[in-house]
């Protein structure tokens, strides 16, 4: 009995969680503002992570870099959800190719998620050399996606 109740609750939660995703697509400003906020989260945490990784300022990686890496990893994981089908509208820096080549776009997001996960592991290990390599991969992942899927400023 408990198992079937748990399954029913889980199914209901999944359905309820999916509804706002489709119900809000008609609100371009909300989608664009949220996307920009998540991307800005990545940008600012990346800047801070790079500084800490380079020892400027000299702070412990397993404290400061760890916090930034967690935020970056979490935000990177959200990226595919930020561009659902039907949200290609409004004033945005996202190119149409985000939706036209969703598989390729999601592959770029996966590369970023993997790079931020490597950064997180380096921070946990307090390994500055590994953190530096991971930050290079984060930068490459961001640039690769921006080159293909973001309008130039």
Predicted regions and their residues:
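The canonical Cys-X-X-Cys-His
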Residues: 138-149
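Extracytoplasmic c-type cytochrome modules immediately beyond a signal peptide or single-pass transmembrane anchor
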Residues: 25-137
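A short hydrophobic/aromatic micro-motif that marks alpha-helical segments and, especially, helix-coil
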Residues: 18, 116-117, 141-142
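Bacterial N-terminal signal peptides that target proteins for export
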Residues: 1-9
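Sec/Tat signal peptide C-region and signal peptidase I cleavage site
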Residues: 17-23
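Inter-heme linker and motif-flanking segments adjacent to c-type heme-binding CXXCH motifs
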Residues: 126, 148-153
């Amino acid at each position: 009995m408990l198992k079937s109740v748990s399954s029913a609750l889980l199914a209901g939660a999944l359905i309820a969680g999916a509804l706002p995703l489709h119900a809000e697509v008609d609100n371009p400003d909300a989608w664009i503002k949220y996307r920009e906020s998540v991307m800005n989260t990545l940008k600012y945490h990346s800047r801070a992570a790079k500084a800490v990784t380079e020892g400027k300022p000299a702070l412990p990686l397993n404290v400061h870099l760890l916090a930034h890496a967690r935020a970056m990893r979490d935000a990177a994981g959200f990226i595919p959800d930020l561009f659902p089908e039907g949200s290609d509208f409004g004033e945005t820096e996202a190119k149409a190719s985000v939706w036209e080549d969703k598989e390729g776009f999601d592959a770029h997001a996966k590369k970023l998620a993997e790079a931020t996960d490597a950064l997180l592991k380096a921070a946990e290990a307090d390994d500055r050399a590994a953190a530096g390599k991971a930050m290079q991969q984060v930068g490459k992942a961001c640039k690769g996606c921006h080159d293909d899927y973001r309008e130039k400023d």
